[in-house]
Amino acid sequence: MIRKAKQSQKAGDGSNQYQAETIIVQNGIDEKRAREICNEMFAATRRELSEEAYDAACRRVNEFENDLIPKMQKIDGALDAFADPAFQFLIADAHKTAASTDRPADYSLLSELLIHRIQRGQNRATIAGISRAVEIVDEIADVALLALSVSFAVEQYNPTSGSIFQGLDVLDSLFEKLCYAELPSGSMWLDHLDILDAIRMSHFGKLKKLEEYYAETMPGYCVAGIKKDTENYAKAQQLLVEAGLPSTIMVNNELDNQYVRLALVSRERISSLSLTSVRIIDGQTIQTTTKLTADQEKTLGDIWNLYDNDASTLERIKAQFYHEIINRPNLRKVQAWWNNVPTAFNTTAVGKVLAHANAKRCDPSLPDLN
């Protein structure tokens, strides 16, 4: 926006007049203008309210805006979304939902949904999910949202650490943050979420047991690996040397120290690995990170192929993995709940954005939803 400041000119009789003009250029929308737009969008909703409801609605909407705008200010260019008509309509819907609820957590949840709209606004399916989610924030029961968020976290988040114990500790810490209340039993919460279009219940079958699900999605944690002091062990060490890879990429298997394994959650993670080298030049530490070459990736795949696949050994490793899950209090709590969910279900686009927004509210460090 370009705005002209007030102009002033003074001159004596017969003298030349020179006009000074200041041009103020404003790039984008600042906090003040963002709040003005919010106020303009809420004006229509205010007109629909009775005198008795007016004060409560204004207070709630103000709490919502005070949660939203500081979050948007932390994201480069996010306030410019207020110039988008589609975002303004979404703000208007969020105002109606905020005015209808007195749960403080709902204001934070609405904020996270709008932030997600800014960050993933090019995907029409996501936009549709967010729009519907904004409408039902005030309708979803606390325990249903909790269950939705925990089930979403089970399916969405896996650790990246190559260490089995560290990876499970990360999950345990996550569920400590997400399980802010007692998880629901029975099927009422499922019916409730199905009515709100957050899930689609399947009346055929049950969810796979949590420990089995994690064993499948984190296969690098449930391998035996290569037994020490064997021919395959020597072969693996030689392959690492020939490929110029550090021997530290092979670690003791925490579930059986007779074996070593690649420090990976899954074989697919090989393609995302990189090597970091540290050099000291003129007293300064220089750190360089490079992607693995195709040959190095192939070498790690060849080492994976050397793993012991004896069925009885793998069953023993898997049993130890299950034990490590129940040895962590929050994972044990989620496992006991998950394994007793009465029926299988699929989370819809609406449910995913709701669950993600609530999870981010509990743990802001979580990655954004793709």
Spans of model-derived segments:
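Short amphipathic alpha-helical interface segments
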Residues: 135-181
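Intrinsically disordered, low-complexity segments
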Residues: 363-370
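Amphipathic alpha-helical interaction segments
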Residues: 117, 121, 155-159, 200
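Long, low-complexity intrinsically disordered regions enriched in small/polar
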Residues: 1-51, 55
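Accessory beta->alpha helical hairpin/"wing" motif in late/C-terminal subdomains of nucleic-acid enzymes
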Residues: 104-118, 165, 181, 186, ...
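Long, low-complexity, charged/polar intrinsically disordered regions in eukaryotic proteins
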Residues: 82-139
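Extended, charge-enriched "interface" segments that sit outside catalytic cores
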Residues: 61
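N-terminal leader regions that mediate targeting or early regulatory function
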Residues: 64, 68-90
